């Protein structure tokens, strides 16, 4: 669902700080970060991409094009909070400044509960110390055999076409190095094309749920709001659906079908400035689809849960409270631990609607870890895929016949994290055929 915008995965912050301090102590000449130039004129290679993918984009589409090293504006930005604007349209169309940013995110879990995909596509200048430019893409994968692979890719240009029937986003570096996502206006279908030296192929996502706001209201609604927590906006174009993944990663096949979803974030400040923790769950079990997102604000220390449950594609429950109530719908979210184990092996999700007199319970059992990172001083995060089981519990505490399925879950804690104001570039690859890390630190 979400992914921390810190791309130094699998290495602790103290290691980065040590490299930085040693460089300063011994007066090492630190390399400047290269501003990678596109292979050719963006107008030329964008036309080639359109032709490769047979993209027929009418002149009536609104085109929003930004370059990775555009100067950030000093004036106030156009920051969209419209509840009826297409969820996938750019929310910062006039450009970026040093703090505001936005993200398009897609995730998937295989029907085995053992493979998974997490994709983040960013327009974000607030983490310039992570690498060159304002446009990056993060991709985390796990295979059934527990092999994981992660990458962060920085692109030269970002172009978003907002049309009457769809939104098309192109993050590109050349005619041979690009990512393209297309989301239909009704949010019923999304497609992501990958065409890079490392990853080629496509992912298709077919929604089985209605698009929704943080309060659980369905799109479109003129009275709903997109703000989920102070200065943080979040909506779900696709709370859940069927995903078809057909990729090749360094010539290794990555193909499966299962559960998928799509989300949007945009914020006035960077995530580390706005949040101390966040939790995310996406689940499909029989006729049920559950999406859950809960950030904890660094601004006021308050958690902002947003739970949404559908059955056969129809909304049956939503909640914005994580506290037991006799009036308000709420969600309880509890870790499950085996005896003498420090870490949880899964979670139990309890959804209660006092007004309806209804309750749903789902058990989540981990099968594979999608990624884990440590950032020092107790900060870090983990994501898992696995098997889910549950359904509605009736008044006599006899549940309906439990449904089985799969889930994705993520936990991130950055409460204690502080980041030096140095520029850091880190690239990682996990799993065969290459293992390694390259680190550059520069003032």
UniProtKB/Swiss-Prot annotation:
UniProt keyword annotation of Transferase present: no
EC number from the UniProt entry: 5.5.1.-
Keyword annotations: Glycoprotein, Isomerase, Signal
Lineage of the species this protein comes from: Eukaryota, Fungi, Dikarya, Ascomycota, Pezizomycotina
EC supergroup of this enzyme: isomerase
Domain of life: Eukaryota
Name of the protein in question: Diels-Alderase poxQ
Pathway(s) it belongs to: Secondary metabolite biosynthesis
Signal peptide (residue range): 1-23
Pfam families noted in UniProt: DA_C, DA_N
GO molecular function: isomerase activity
Glycosylated residues (UniProt): 78, 97, 145
Naturally occurring in which organism (per UniProt): Penicillium oxalicum
Upregulation: Expression is positively regulated by the oxaleimides biosynthesis cluster-specific transcription factor poxB.
Function, in words: Diels-Alderase; part of the gene cluster that mediates the biosynthesis of oxaleimides, cytotoxic compounds containing an unusual disubstituted succinimide moiety. The first step of the pathway is provided by the HR-PKS poxF that serves in a new mode of collaborative biosynthesis with the PKS-NRPS poxE, by providing the olefin containing amino acid substrate via the synthesis of an ACP-bound dec-4-enoate.
InterPro entries linked: DA_C (IPR054499)
Protein family: Belongs to the Diels-Alderase family.
């Amino acid at each position: 669902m979400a992914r921390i915008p810190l791309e130094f995965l699998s290495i602790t912050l103290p290691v980065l700080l040590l490299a930085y301090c040693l460089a300063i102590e011994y007066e090492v000449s630190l390399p400047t970060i290269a501003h990678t130039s596109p292979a050719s004129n963006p107008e030329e290679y964008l036309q080639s991409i359109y032709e490769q993918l047979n993209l027929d984009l009418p002149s009536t589409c609104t085109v929003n094009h930004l370059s990775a090293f555009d100067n950030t504006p000093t004036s106030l930005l156009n920051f969209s909070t419209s509840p009826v604007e297409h969820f996938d349209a750019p929310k910062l169309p006039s450009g970026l400044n040093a703090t505001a940013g936005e993200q398009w995110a897609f995730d998937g879990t295989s029907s085995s509960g053992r493979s998974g995909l997490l994709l983040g596509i960013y327009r974000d200048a607030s983490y310039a110390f992570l690498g060159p430019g304002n446009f990056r893409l993060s991709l985390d994968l796990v295979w059934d055999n527990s092999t994981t692979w992660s990458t962060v890719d920085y692109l030269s240009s970002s172009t978003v076409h907002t049309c009457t029937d769809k939104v098309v986003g192109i993050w590109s570096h050349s005619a041979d190095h690009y990512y393209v996502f297309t989301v239909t206006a009704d949010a019923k279908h999304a497609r992501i094309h990958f065409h890079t030296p490392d990853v080629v192929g496509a992912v298709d996502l077919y929604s089985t749920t209605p698009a929704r706001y943080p309060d659980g209201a369905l799109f479109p609604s003129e009275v709903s709001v997109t703000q989920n927590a102070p200065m943080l906006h979040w909506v779900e174009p696709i709370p859940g659906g069927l995903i078809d993944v057909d990729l090749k990663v360094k010539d290794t096949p990555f193909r499966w079908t299962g559960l998928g979803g799509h989300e949007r974030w945009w914020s006035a400040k960077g995530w580390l400035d706005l949040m101390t923790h966040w939790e995310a769950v996406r689940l499909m079990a029989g006729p049920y689809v559950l999406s859950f997102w809960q950030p904890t604000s660094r601004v006021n220390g308050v958690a902002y849960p947003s739970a949404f449950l559908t059955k056969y594609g129809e909304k049956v429950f939503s909640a914005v409270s994580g506290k037991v109530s006799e009036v308000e719908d709420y969600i309880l979210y509890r870790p499950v631990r085996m005896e003498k184990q420090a870490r949880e092996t899964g979670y139990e999700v309890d959804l209660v609607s006092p007004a309806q007199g209804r309750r749903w319970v789902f058990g989540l059992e981990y099968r594979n870890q999608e990624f884990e990172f440590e950032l020092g001083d107790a900060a870090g995060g983990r994501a898992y895929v696995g098997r889910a089981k549950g359904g509605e519990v009736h008044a006599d505490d006899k549940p309906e016949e439990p449904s089985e399925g799969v889930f994705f879950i993520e936990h991130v804690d950055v409460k204690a994290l502080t980041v030096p104001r140095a520029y850091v570039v880190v690239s990682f690859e996990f799993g065969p055929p290459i293992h390694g890390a390259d680190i550059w630190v520069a003032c």
